[in-house]
Amino acid sequence: MLYPLLTKTRNTYDLGGIWNFKLGEHNPNELLPSDEVMVIPTSFNDLMVSKEKRDYIGDFWYEKVIEVPKVSEDEEMVLRFGSVTHQAKIYVDGVLVGEHKGGFTPFEVLVPECKYNNEKIKVSICANNVLDYTTLPVGNYSEIIQEDGSIKKKVRENFDFFNYAGVHRPLKLMIRPKNHIFDITITSRLSDDLQSADLHFLVETNQKVDEVRISVFDEDNKLVGETKDSRLFLSDVHLWEVLNAYLYTARVEIFVDNQLQDVYEENFGLREIEVTNGQFLLNRKPIYFKGFGKHEDTFINGRGLNEAANLMDLNLLKDMGANSFRTSHYPYSEEMMRLADRMGVLVIDEVPAVGLFQNFNASLDLSPKDNGTWNLMQTKAAHEQAIQELVKRDKNHPSVVMWVVANEPASHEAGAHDYFEPLVKLYKDLDPQKRPVTLVNILMATPDRDQVMDLVDVVCLNRYYGWYVDHGDLTNAEVGIRKELLEWQDKFPDKPIIITEYGADTLPGLHSTWNIPYTEEFQCDFYEMSHRVFDGIPNLVGEQVWNFADFETNLMILRVQGNHKGLFSRNRQPKQVVKEFKKRWMTIPHYHNKKNSVK
């Protein structure tokens, strides 16, 4: 899906700002009362003073009367949503015009043509934040009958982050040609000497056109190639490299009877990805991933788009010598992906497939029992849709170097292989760049119990030795994690290993002479132990800390106003360990052939 840009043939109007708002039922044929308002884009939760409203589950409404811009007879009007979490129904003047399920990918709805001559239209958005065993993420949904006979809806999350909800990303009103560019796919093949590239363009239009013209510009806006065919050869190319991004721009124009119908510009980078011999190669050089699992999570905004925080986070990431992040545990905003492209940051791109086990307590149970997860889950349709929409959205981003099919599912239980095999294949069939696919493995899915890692290209592990296992005992933890990593390497000698989560909750300012858990001293010792092990595993090609910053969670005995595993506090202030990471990561090259340095 194309990002909403202003071009010669397209107008975009930002509908963000203050909207009328209501939790609960509403008839869209009536006006929504204006006694309560809400911001778009943002999460509604943390703007609520009332705890009951903050934790509300069910339908909630946004409504606004907007001016109708001029629309010519050969144009159409579209409402384009960056995301609505988790379900949405869109009404224009009380009439349902579109709906979408899935809270982290964009969608659009056409405004009926009969409304184009109206002076104003009323846009109503019915959003819903219910999660159950058919949705991604997964939640345990229940209904409680209150004393007054009313029904209270409740979701017990199968995941360890707060169920923020709302119109989280930009809402645009677009005026575009009826005959328009629907999608653009760009692929490339680099020459043996990496000095030139063959480009292929697939331009999809919603109507037949006579001609497609493609012009490619470099970063100085100099024309470097043009074609009326689907192919183009570029010489003396600049590669997209780690923290040294180079973006070309493809201007696509479509014509009928020599008349311009639509124009759109898509950025792209030239780079090559390969997984081979236990290494992850970018432009034929081995990469070492240094970075983080993150969350879209800030004060007041919740999960709503915060572009200032995005930029601050990537500035802090680069300052530490890091080069990557994972979009844990859902697709991040299009704005963040475009920023990563521009800054040369590697992205491991994840669908919202989190909570794929019986319940959250089951995820903490390290015993080998089978909880019957794959007989319980009804998420297949939602999972397929999430993969399709993510690949459609992110396929051209050079920053995206790997797809994630799920985070910490019950991959050790019977039925896991049958569930994931077609989903991994779906990724590979859909992705025009044929990126590697991985699954982020849960702690109890050890090499002898896991049933799915044979399906994926890279072994990604979330491991908490010294925290959830051998809590506070770093001596035993070091023995345990080294033993398991060597077992994974022996089982899959040709697959690289990335630690996608490791960490320890740490309260800023809490100290101890004896380095006990939750102190800043223990966090430093925890990571020192972990890195000592990582450095001795030849196939281990990356370390992504859990987490970049502290973040909000649902209520549980393990959480004191959120998860505190961040290297930074929630307001992005560094903990003591940040300087230790900076020392380490500044000495590890981004391109690092580890097999040459590990004996």
Swiss-Prot record:
GO MF term set: beta-galactosidase activity; beta-glucuronidase activity; carbohydrate binding
Catalytic activity: a beta-D-glucuronoside + H2O = D-glucuronate + an alcohol
Cited Gene3D superfamilies: Galactose-binding domain-like, Glycosidases, Immunoglobulins
Keyword field contains Hydrolase: yes
Keyword Hydrolase: yes
Family from the record: Belongs to the glycosyl hydrolase 2 family.
Record-given protein name: Beta-glucuronidase
Phylogenetic classification of the source organism: Bacteria, Bacillati, Bacillota, Bacilli, Lactobacillales
